[in-house]
Protein backbone atom coordinates (compact mmCIF):
# COMPACT_ATOMS: atom_id res chain seq x y z
CA UNK A 1 0.00 0.00 0.00
CA UNK A 2 1.27 3.46 -0.91
CA UNK A 3 2.02 6.08 1.75
CA UNK A 4 -0.67 8.39 0.30
CA UNK A 5 -3.30 5.65 0.59
CA UNK A 6 -2.39 4.97 4.21
CA UNK A 7 -2.68 8.66 5.09
CA UNK A 8 -6.04 8.92 3.33
CA UNK A 9 -7.48 5.99 5.26
CA UNK A 10 -6.01 7.33 8.50
CA UNK A 11 -7.80 10.65 7.98
CA UNK A 12 -11.05 8.88 7.11
CA UNK A 13 -10.91 6.94 10.37
CA UNK A 14 -9.79 9.97 12.40
CA UNK A 15 -6.75 8.13 13.70
CA UNK A 16 -4.48 9.97 16.09
CA UNK A 17 -0.73 10.44 15.72
CA UNK A 18 0.02 7.02 17.24
CA UNK A 19 -2.46 5.34 14.95
CA UNK A 20 -0.93 6.98 11.90
CA UNK A 21 2.56 5.87 13.00
CA UNK A 22 1.35 2.28 13.33
CA UNK A 23 -0.07 2.42 9.82
CA UNK A 24 3.16 3.86 8.40
CA UNK A 25 5.19 1.05 9.99
CA UNK A 26 3.07 -1.42 8.06
CA UNK A 27 4.22 -0.08 4.69
CA UNK A 28 5.93 -3.04 3.09
CA UNK A 29 9.53 -2.44 2.09
CA UNK A 30 10.26 -3.75 -1.37
CA UNK A 31 12.76 -6.59 -1.31
CA UNK A 32 16.24 -5.44 -2.28
CA UNK A 33 17.08 -6.27 -5.89
CA UNK A 34 13.47 -6.72 -6.99
CA UNK A 35 14.01 -4.52 -10.04
CA UNK A 36 16.67 -6.82 -11.49
CA UNK A 37 14.45 -9.85 -11.01
CA UNK A 38 11.39 -8.30 -12.67
CA UNK A 39 12.68 -6.40 -15.69
CA UNK A 40 12.51 -9.42 -17.98
CA UNK A 41 8.81 -9.69 -17.15
CA UNK A 42 8.17 -6.18 -18.39
CA UNK A 43 7.11 -4.63 -15.09
CA UNK A 44 9.53 -1.73 -15.48
CA UNK A 45 10.67 -1.75 -19.09
CA UNK A 46 11.85 -4.70 -21.12
CA UNK A 47 15.43 -5.90 -21.21
CA UNK A 48 15.01 -8.37 -24.02
CA UNK A 49 13.26 -8.31 -27.37
CA UNK A 50 11.42 -11.41 -28.58
CA UNK A 51 14.45 -12.45 -30.62
CA UNK A 52 16.61 -12.39 -27.48
CA UNK A 53 18.33 -9.11 -28.33
CA UNK A 54 18.92 -6.91 -25.34
CA UNK A 55 17.89 -3.31 -25.84
CA UNK A 56 17.48 -1.92 -22.32
CA UNK A 57 20.59 -2.68 -20.29
CA UNK A 58 23.17 -3.84 -22.81
CA UNK A 59 25.72 -1.17 -23.60
CA UNK A 60 24.80 1.13 -20.72
CA UNK A 61 28.42 1.99 -19.96
CA UNK A 62 29.54 2.36 -23.57
CA UNK A 63 26.45 4.21 -24.78
CA UNK A 64 25.61 6.38 -21.77
CA UNK A 65 29.09 6.84 -20.31
CA UNK A 66 31.41 6.53 -23.33
CA UNK A 67 34.38 8.25 -21.68
CA UNK A 68 34.25 5.84 -18.75
CA UNK A 69 34.06 2.95 -21.21
CA UNK A 70 37.09 4.25 -23.10
CA UNK A 71 39.06 4.76 -19.89
CA UNK A 72 38.28 1.22 -18.77
CA UNK A 73 39.38 -0.24 -22.11
CA UNK A 74 42.68 1.63 -21.84
CA UNK A 75 43.12 0.35 -18.29
CA UNK A 76 42.60 -3.32 -19.08
CA UNK A 77 44.57 -3.23 -22.34
CA UNK A 78 47.57 -1.77 -20.51
CA UNK A 79 47.88 -4.89 -18.33
CA UNK A 80 49.59 -7.97 -19.75
CA UNK A 81 49.56 -10.12 -16.61
CA UNK A 82 45.83 -10.73 -16.22
CA UNK A 83 44.71 -14.36 -16.30
CA UNK A 84 41.57 -14.34 -14.15
CA UNK A 85 38.76 -11.77 -14.30
CA UNK A 86 35.64 -11.17 -12.23
CA UNK A 87 32.98 -8.71 -13.33
CA UNK A 88 30.66 -7.76 -10.48
CA UNK A 89 27.29 -6.74 -11.85
CA UNK A 90 27.76 -8.09 -15.36
CA UNK A 91 24.13 -7.40 -16.26
CA UNK A 92 23.24 -9.07 -19.51
CA UNK A 93 26.83 -9.42 -20.59
CA UNK A 94 27.83 -6.34 -22.54
CA UNK A 95 31.55 -6.87 -22.02
CA UNK A 96 31.78 -10.68 -22.32
CA UNK A 97 29.49 -10.65 -25.36
CA UNK A 98 30.31 -7.44 -27.23
CA UNK A 99 33.95 -7.22 -26.14
CA UNK A 100 34.77 -10.89 -25.66
CA UNK A 101 38.17 -10.34 -27.27
CA UNK A 102 39.21 -8.57 -24.04
CA UNK A 103 39.06 -11.91 -22.26
CA UNK A 104 40.71 -14.17 -24.81
CA UNK A 105 43.00 -16.65 -23.06
CA UNK A 106 41.61 -15.45 -19.73
CA UNK A 107 39.30 -17.05 -17.19
CA UNK A 108 36.29 -14.71 -17.01
CA UNK A 109 33.45 -14.97 -14.51
CA UNK A 110 30.39 -12.73 -14.66
CA UNK A 111 28.35 -12.26 -11.49
CA UNK A 112 25.01 -10.53 -11.08
CA UNK A 113 22.16 -10.50 -8.58
CA UNK A 114 19.59 -10.58 -11.39
CA UNK A 115 18.63 -14.08 -12.50
CA UNK A 116 17.05 -12.95 -15.81
CA UNK A 117 20.29 -11.23 -16.80
CA UNK A 118 22.41 -14.25 -15.90
CA UNK A 119 20.12 -16.55 -17.89
CA UNK A 120 20.52 -14.25 -20.88
CA UNK A 121 24.32 -14.34 -20.51
CA UNK A 122 24.42 -18.12 -20.36
CA UNK A 123 22.37 -18.33 -23.54
CA UNK A 124 24.55 -15.88 -25.45
CA UNK A 125 28.10 -16.45 -24.20
CA UNK A 126 30.48 -19.33 -23.58
CA UNK A 127 31.99 -17.68 -20.51
CA UNK A 128 30.99 -18.60 -16.97
CA UNK A 129 28.26 -16.74 -15.08
CA UNK A 130 26.67 -17.07 -11.65
CA UNK A 131 23.71 -15.41 -9.97
CA UNK A 132 24.62 -14.39 -6.44
CA UNK A 133 24.97 -11.53 -3.97
CA UNK A 134 28.64 -10.49 -4.15
CA UNK A 135 28.66 -9.15 -0.59
CA UNK A 136 27.25 -12.34 0.95
CA UNK A 137 28.50 -15.06 -1.40
CA UNK A 138 30.77 -17.74 0.02
CA UNK A 139 33.97 -17.77 -1.99
CA UNK A 140 37.61 -17.29 -1.15
CA UNK A 141 38.84 -17.16 -4.73
CA UNK A 142 40.95 -14.19 -5.77
CA UNK A 143 41.14 -12.65 -9.23
CA UNK A 144 43.84 -10.78 -11.10
CA UNK A 145 41.28 -8.19 -12.19
CA UNK A 146 37.91 -7.25 -10.72
CA UNK A 147 35.80 -4.62 -12.42
CA UNK A 148 32.37 -3.21 -11.76
CA UNK A 149 30.48 -0.48 -13.59
CA UNK A 150 27.59 1.52 -12.08
CA UNK A 151 26.88 -1.09 -9.41
CA UNK A 152 28.37 0.33 -6.23
CA UNK A 153 25.89 3.24 -6.52
CA UNK A 154 23.03 0.77 -5.91
CA UNK A 155 24.29 -1.71 -3.30
CA UNK A 156 22.91 -1.92 0.25
CA UNK A 157 26.34 -1.83 1.94
CA UNK A 158 28.88 0.29 0.06
CA UNK A 159 31.81 -0.27 2.41
CA UNK A 160 31.35 -4.05 2.52
CA UNK A 161 31.03 -4.17 -1.27
CA UNK A 162 34.25 -2.20 -1.72
CA UNK A 163 36.07 -4.20 0.95
CA UNK A 164 35.06 -7.45 -0.73
CA UNK A 165 36.52 -6.23 -4.01
CA UNK A 166 39.81 -5.33 -2.32
CA UNK A 167 40.15 -8.65 -0.51
CA UNK A 168 39.23 -10.61 -3.65
CA UNK A 169 41.62 -8.69 -5.91
CA UNK A 170 45.14 -10.03 -6.45
CA UNK A 171 46.37 -7.29 -8.77
CA UNK A 172 43.91 -4.81 -10.26
CA UNK A 173 40.44 -3.37 -9.82
CA UNK A 174 38.40 -0.81 -11.73
CA UNK A 175 35.18 0.51 -10.16
CA UNK A 176 32.98 3.24 -11.60
CA UNK A 177 30.23 5.11 -9.74
CA UNK A 178 28.12 7.14 -12.15
CA UNK A 179 26.10 9.34 -9.81
CA UNK A 180 28.82 11.94 -9.36
CA UNK A 181 32.04 12.76 -7.55
CA UNK A 182 31.65 13.92 -3.95
CA UNK A 183 35.00 14.84 -2.35
CA UNK A 184 33.41 16.87 0.45
CA UNK A 185 30.94 14.30 1.77
CA UNK A 186 32.00 12.88 5.12
CA UNK A 187 29.93 9.74 4.60
CA UNK A 188 27.93 8.12 1.82
CA UNK A 189 24.49 9.58 1.18
CA UNK A 190 22.11 6.70 0.50
CA UNK A 191 18.51 6.83 -0.72
CA UNK A 192 16.33 3.72 -0.95
CA UNK A 193 14.06 3.59 -3.98
CA UNK A 194 11.22 1.46 -2.67
CA UNK A 195 9.55 1.23 -6.07
CA UNK A 196 12.55 -0.68 -7.43
CA UNK A 197 14.04 -2.21 -4.33
CA UNK A 198 17.42 -0.60 -4.82
CA UNK A 199 19.58 2.23 -3.52
CA UNK A 200 20.71 5.37 -5.32
CA UNK A 201 23.75 6.64 -3.47
CA UNK A 202 26.26 9.47 -3.58
CA UNK A 203 29.62 8.05 -2.58
CA UNK A 204 31.92 9.92 -0.23
CA UNK A 205 35.45 10.02 -1.67
CA UNK A 206 36.76 10.41 1.88
CA UNK A 207 34.96 7.28 3.03
CA UNK A 208 36.17 5.33 0.00
CA UNK A 209 39.75 6.22 0.86
CA UNK A 210 39.20 5.20 4.48
CA UNK A 211 37.88 1.79 3.41
CA UNK A 212 40.78 1.18 1.02
CA UNK A 213 43.38 2.11 3.63
CA UNK A 214 41.62 0.00 6.27
CA UNK A 215 41.96 -2.93 3.88
CA UNK A 216 45.74 -2.40 3.90
CA UNK A 217 46.19 -0.73 0.55
CA UNK A 218 48.97 1.84 0.52
CA UNK A 219 48.39 5.34 -0.86
CA UNK A 220 50.29 4.55 -4.06
CA UNK A 221 48.18 1.46 -4.80
CA UNK A 222 44.91 3.22 -5.52
CA UNK A 223 43.38 6.36 -6.97
CA UNK A 224 39.96 7.97 -6.49
CA UNK A 225 39.14 10.56 -9.10
CA UNK A 226 36.24 12.45 -10.57
CA UNK A 227 36.24 12.10 -14.36
CA UNK A 228 33.95 13.24 -17.15
CA UNK A 229 31.92 10.23 -18.26
CA UNK A 230 30.45 11.59 -21.48
CA UNK A 231 26.79 11.27 -20.54
CA UNK A 232 24.38 13.51 -22.46
CA UNK A 233 22.99 15.81 -19.81
CA UNK A 234 20.03 16.91 -21.95
CA UNK A 235 18.53 13.41 -21.93
CA UNK A 236 15.81 12.25 -19.49
CA UNK A 237 18.00 9.42 -18.17
CA UNK A 238 20.62 11.91 -16.97
CA UNK A 239 18.29 13.79 -14.62
CA UNK A 240 20.11 14.59 -11.39
CA UNK A 241 23.51 13.63 -12.76
CA UNK A 242 26.52 15.89 -13.25
CA UNK A 243 28.43 14.24 -16.08
CA UNK A 244 31.20 13.35 -13.65
CA UNK A 245 31.74 9.79 -12.39
CA UNK A 246 33.85 8.55 -9.51
CA UNK A 247 36.53 6.19 -10.80
CA UNK A 248 38.37 3.94 -8.34
CA UNK A 249 41.46 2.16 -9.62
CA UNK A 250 43.54 -0.35 -7.70
CA UNK A 251 46.98 -1.50 -8.79
CA UNK A 252 48.72 -3.58 -6.16
CA UNK A 253 52.48 -3.15 -6.04
CA UNK A 254 53.15 -6.54 -4.48
CA UNK A 255 50.30 -8.28 -6.35
CA UNK A 256 49.39 -11.66 -4.86
CA UNK A 257 51.52 -11.24 -1.74
CA UNK A 258 48.64 -9.49 -0.01
Model-identified regions with their sequence ranges:
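A short SAM/SAH-binding and catalytic strip from SAM-dependent methyltransferases
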Residues: 145-156
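Conserved S-adenosyl-L-methionine
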Residues: 218-230
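Conserved class I S-adenosyl-L-methionine
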Residues: 174-202
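Conserved N-terminal segment of class I S-adenosyl-L-methionine
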Residues: 1-137, 149, 246, 255-257
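Short alpha-helix
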Residues: 198-216
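A short glycine-rich, Lys/Arg-flanked "PGG" loop and its adjoining helix->strand segment in the class I
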Residues: 160-173
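A short acidic, Gly/Pro-enriched loop at the edge of an enzyme's catalytic core
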Residues: 138-145
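Core SAM-dependent methyltransferase catalytic element
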Residues: 228-258
Amino acid sequence: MKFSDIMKKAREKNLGRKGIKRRIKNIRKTEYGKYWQDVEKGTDGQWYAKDGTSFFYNGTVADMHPLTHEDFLNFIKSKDDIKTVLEVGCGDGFYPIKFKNLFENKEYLGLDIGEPAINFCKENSNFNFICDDFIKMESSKKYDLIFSHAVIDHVYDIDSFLSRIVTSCKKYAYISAYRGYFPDLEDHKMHYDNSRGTYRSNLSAKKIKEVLVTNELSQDEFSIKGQKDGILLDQPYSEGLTGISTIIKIERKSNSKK
